[in-house]
Structures are given as structure tokens and as C-alpha cells.
């Protein structure tokens, strides 16, 4: 009898929860319409996979890419609408959040073509791979719009869990298994530290979880200068640091870059930084409004360490992916300058502009690495020697992307860094900008070292990998070259294209 009553109560409670969730989705679903498109794409992938055979694999790519493109279109149609807070305060829609969501969708759209030939050559499971990519994209989009502590924690966990699975997708590779284990342990530790910081923020504000309400709660409780807020700030900075991977929270990055499948590294190298930057900007700028001097100092230290250590350690690397891992650590130092500058001197606009260029530069470089790796089976920098003699298009594409990453004029990377450093200089960050300029010059050295190898024609320097280099006969080869071409063009855009990009970026500030 007691069991029967308990069972009825459980059914009633479950029904109430389901109805409440349905009610929220019914009346707030339009505010997450781009995310709903991705969810529909995920469901469609599962349905087709369960009812079809392996001959329908092109449909999987088509559905994934189409859902991403439609989601981007829906996001653009919603552009310049008034800011809206939905789902009982859990989610906020505004231009600032939407441009970061657009960047994440753009990354995913470009990464799927990079994966086609790699998946076919390595015989990986296609459906699960695309499901993880779309789910991680969904988690990143929700993180950009998250407006309360619970959503800010759950959304990156959705992204992180898919990232762990993707990094260990080649199960027979020992390096991949090692990278996944390190990534999982470091990610779990960082999430624990992040939640610890959230708990201090929650308690100090009198039990508030929405970002703006936390500020009001801190004013009411007079706890905005308390030691608890300092503990929360340090814990949250450390937790977010593992997501952004600046120095000294970068230990996992080189191993994960080297051990994970190259298309996965391309995806993680940009989407994780875009989503974490959006989240860090909102968390630090809103709840820690009264501690701006403290978190500015913390970020300045992280930026200096990242720019110096990242670029110095990149010089000594022999693996192309490890070199790009340390390069990305230096690049996040430049992005942090924009976060520190903030809204007052176009800091956010410069950060967004540089991130847009960084996406094209980085993905273009990884597209070249994927193509070279599939045709030669090597990742060693020395094995790129003489590539220009065998494949001029691939060698020139890689050279242009690397030069743009280094910030050489008149490439896009130069103008992105110029605007970012100029905003930092106007904000009085003279020392930080000086370090950024010096480390940018340093980065040019190891990029030019690779380009010199690409263009060499001396037989004694050319390895057997390039001597036996053959173009892949696979038809899907065109999809990688398409993504590569798009990224190379975007990386080499002259400065005349900066004005419309800056105007859009400046219009996204919240």
C-alpha cells in the first residue's frame, strides 16, 4: 500500500516537472530558436542512423552542415533585437551573446568538412562523431547566453563531456588515450574549483544565482568587498583558466593537441576559447563589478605569462600540433587584453574582431595539417621540408595562414592585433601592450622557420615523406580544400575590410 502511494506521488511529481518544462519551452522556445534547430538536427541524425545503412553517410554530413547553416541564418535574422531574458532568468539574448554564438556556429560549420576525409581514412564512427560536434556546439551556444550560475556550470559541462569523448575518439591510439585521461582529470578538477567559487558567490549575495541579481544581493548584504568575494574571484578565475588554457593553466593543452584527432583539435582550439571568453567576460564584468581592479590584475598576470611562455615554448617544438598548442596559449594572452580593456575603449569590439580573424587563421592552418597528415602520415615539422615542390597550393595556403597568425601586414592577423593593441594602449595598458608587441615579433620567428622549410628546394633537406608525396584520390578531398580556401581568403583580407567588421563588432556591446 505504501509503495503504491509513493509510486503515485512519483508519477504526479514527474508529470508536474514535465508540464512545467513543456510550458517553459512553449512560451520561451522562440528565444532559443537557433539552438532548437541544432536539437532537431541531432534527433534527425539519430533517426536516420537507426533506420539506414552505411551507404547513406553523405546524408549525415549534409544534415549536420545544413542544421548549422540554418541556425546561423536564424541567428542573423534575430540580429539587433532588444535584449530579452527568458526561461525564468536562466538565459539572456542580446547582440553580445549572439555574436559569440555566431562565431561558435561558424567554427563548427568549417570543421565538419575538415573531418570528412579523415573519418573515411581512419574508419571512425561517423554518426557519433557528428553528434558530439553538434552537442558541443549546442553547449557552447547555451554557455554564451547563460544568465545564472547553474546554466553557466551545466552548459560548459555539456561542451566538455563531448570534448573528452572527441579527444579519445581514436581508441587504439595510446597518445589519444593519454590525452583524454589528462583532459578529463584536469577538466574535472577545474569544474570543481569553478563550482567552489560559485558557492562563495551564491552565499555572499544572499542566495542569488542570476548574474545581475547577484550584484544587487552583494549590495544588500554589504559583502562586495568581503574575503568571500576574493575567494570566489580566485576560484572562478582558476576554473575559467583551465577552459581558456592561458599559462599557468596550460599543462593539458599540448598533450591534448598532439594526441587527439587533428579535426577534433581544430574544433576544440577555437570553439572552447570563444565560448569561455564570452562566459569569462560576463562573469567578471557583472558579478565582480566591485572587484574590477582585482580581476584586472589577475588577468594581466595571466596575459603576460601566456604571451611569454606560449611563444617561447613554441620555438622548441618539433611537432606541428604541439607548436600550435603553445601558439594558442600565446594567442589567448592577446584576447585577454580585450577583456581587460572592456567596454570603455572598444576592448570587446577588438576582442571579437581578433577572434573572428583567429578562427580563420587557425582553422586554415589545421586544414593544411589535416591534408598533409592524411597524405604523408606525419606531424613532424621537419617533414614539411620541400612541400612547395610537390604541392604549391597547400604550401602557400599554410604559409599565408602562419604569416597571418604571426601578424605580418597586410594580412588580417596584423590588423586584428593592431586594433587590439591600440585599444589596450588607449586604456593605459602600456606594459601589457609592449609585451604583446615583443612576443608577436618572437612568434614570427618560428612561423618563418616553418615557411622556410616549406619553400626549400634542396634535396638533402627533403624527407622521404615529401619525396613520396601523392595527392589523395578521394572525392571528399574537395571538402577539406574548400574549407581551407575559405579560411585562407579570410586570413588574407586586406585592411579595407576592417571597417564593416569593426562597425558590427562595436554594435554588439551590452
From Swiss-Prot:
Keyword Transferase applies: no
Subcellular location: Plastid, Chloroplast thylakoid membrane
Pfam families for the chain: Ndh2_N, Proton_antipo_M
Name of the top EC class for this enzyme: translocase
Disulfide links within the chain: none
Signal sequence range: none
Taxonomic superkingdom: Eukaryota
GO biological process terms, semicolon-separated: ATP synthesis coupled electron transport; photosynthesis, light reaction
Assigned keywords, A-Z: Chloroplast, Membrane, NAD, NADP, Plastid, Plastoquinone, Quinone, Thylakoid, Translocase, Transmembrane, Transmembrane helix, Transport
Protein's membrane topology: Multi-pass membrane protein
EC number of the protein: 7.1.1.-
UniProt-recorded Gene Ontology molecular function terms: NADH dehydrogenase (ubiquinone) activity; quinone binding
Catalytic activity: a plastoquinone + NADH + (n+1) H(+)(in) = a plastoquinol + NAD(+) + n H(+)(out); a plastoquinone + NADPH + (n+1) H(+)(in) = a plastoquinol + NADP(+) + n H(+)(out)
Stated role: NDH shuttles electrons from NAD(P)H:plastoquinone, via FMN and iron-sulfur (Fe-S) centers, to quinones in the photosynthetic chain and possibly in a chloroplast respiratory chain. The immediate electron acceptor for the enzyme in this species is believed to be plastoquinone. Couples the redox reaction to proton translocation, and thus conserves the redox energy in a proton gradient.
Annotated family: Belongs to the complex I subunit 2 family.
Protein name stated in the entry: NAD(P)H-quinone oxidoreductase subunit 2 A, chloroplastic
Organism: Lolium perenne (Perennial ryegrass)
